[in-house]
Amino acid sequence: MTLFESARAVANAGGDGAIDWDAVSEAAKAATDPGDLDLSEAEAEAYAADVRDARAQLRDVSGLEFDVPETVEIQNRHHWVDANVATFRRVFEPLNERASYLPGVARSLNTATTAGALAFVSRHVLGQYDPLLLADTSDHALYFVHPNVVGAADSLDVAFPRFRRWIAFHEVTHAAEFGAAPWLADHLEDQLEAGVAALADGEVRREAFRELHVAMTAVEGYAELLMDEAFDGEYADLRAKLDARRRGGSPLTNLVKRALGLQLKREQYERGRAFFETVAAERGLAGASRVWDDPEYLPTDAELDAPRAWLARVTDSAGETAE
């Protein structure tokens, strides 16, 4: 697979939609080395054991009832691309339904941009909890991109089993959140559908995307808090190294991250973590977990920077007396 093959896949993009998803998959994979996925049975079982342990310890610490996907998918980069092309295809279906008027050059540009984004992320993503938004199933999925986990552990000078376990705990925290808040997937789907439908009509509904960003900031921030409570070992060095990894990279890499909006992901981690650290300091983990009781308890954009205002609102809504 070569960049030439990737370019050829984009050039041959066809169909009637805004994006040729088959060409996206082909081009993204042509531009990306799949990585080594030669695991022994014991190595594969170690991932599953970490997930089981994470579920047990997260339930004990948080009191949240949730399940993890029955199948833990240990992927190479191409597998991850395929899984996410399927998600993107579902999310952007309204664009394809209303884009038959697009000239071929626009379709090729959309295809190339999406393929480039997926190729780039596939080389960096470590794990992913996938709630399978907008899918015709109530199932969910858990992915570990093994070549990237191995590479990151090596570059950060961290023992692979310990790093693998850290990633497993982080992704299982997301399963805990979606399990604790059955409404969360529907809420995210509503915002996605509203935003994409507006784009299909030639509009930009900023409010939908803003609410989506705020919700994901809460998701990432609570996950960071829960990780700190549940992980079974020293983690300060892992946290510091991963924070540096999120902020680091060459100037070109950082430019690409900014262009793809990946800097927003780092902002979600940092802003969400600061919010929940303040909440937990005042009301403990149980107080922070109130965020999943009702969609109305999600913080607003302003409250993310004023967590005590959120605490006051949630306390008043529940008819409680503030401490």
Language-model-detected regions and their locations in the chain:
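Catalytic Zn2+-binding segment of zinc metalloproteases
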Residues: 171-188
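Short alpha-helical functional segments enriched in proximate histidine and acidic residues
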Residues: 57, 175, 179, 226
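Active-site rim elements
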Residues: 38-41, 206-214, 259-265
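Pan-zinc metallopeptidase signature
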Residues: 222-323
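N-terminal low-structure segments adjacent to metalloprotease catalytic domains
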Residues: 1-82, 161, 287-323
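Acidic/histidine-rich catalytic neighborhood
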Residues: 186-223
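Auxiliary, metal-adjacent structural segments of Zn-dependent hydrolase domains
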Residues: 48-148
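Short pre-active-site segment immediately N-terminal to the catalytic Zn-binding motif
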Residues: 150-167
